[in-house]
Amino acid sequence: MLDIGGPIRVTDYGGQGPLILLVHGLGGSTENWDVAGPLLTGSGRVCAVDLIGFGESTPGERGPSVEENGLLVADVIDAIGYDNATLIGNSMGGLVSMITAVEHASRVDRLVLVDPALPVSRRHPPDFEVLTKLIGPLVPGIGVPAFRVYRAAHSPEEETAETLRMVTANSETVPEWARDRLTDANRRRRRHGWAIPSFLEADRSIARYVLRPRRFSRLIHKISAPTLLVHGSEDRLVSVDSARWAAEQRPDWTYEEMEGVGHVPMLEAAEWFVDLVTDWLEATT
């Protein structure tokens, strides 16, 4: 644990050389990187962080908004003992990493965005199940009770299975041991009274970006670090149309589309994902 305005959990997967910091998405934790993290250690020292209000990182002096977590990522790089890092962020973690890259540019050497939170596609908006899970809780007075009712009716194992079904194109490709770790993390999360309010606050902070395309466009145009954008063609949470829009906004970025893969390539197709990342890291060294 690091002490950065409160306890912050960092998982160190090992490796030597420049720092590669992995940043999870909404409702996730460092366990989201347990498959891909060790595979990346040939490219540097690989660590993953539990963002504020997620995993085992208790909210303290700071809250769980994407802005606060953008600052946290910069502070974690410093606390681990590096001047800068390559950030690899998935979903909300991609947005957090973009904010770090803009607000603390000297701390970000390179940026890898993995199915990051992006403006909602008008042609292919999220389906009903996704809207219910991500937008429904934002309705005043609904969020906390809805979470409690859901968890009362679903075991940690059932919640993990349902989540993986939603965020992958084929959940069977997620290793059983990784599924077990995600379930254990889910079980621990249920014991934290701050977990649901943190999820809701973070979700609201994401909405302030993804529902405002012009604001998002201004953000990505301020990023100066070399950037790789990786996106699954079958992502139900963030349409591949949104990724193509981002790639058009920044033609200088490298864009890789993973055919037949969902929202979490690092879990669903880890070896393919790592090959894409390591090849790009070598090409941009």
How should these model regions be labeled?
Residues 149-221:
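Conserved alpha/beta-hydrolase catalytic His-Asp/Glu region
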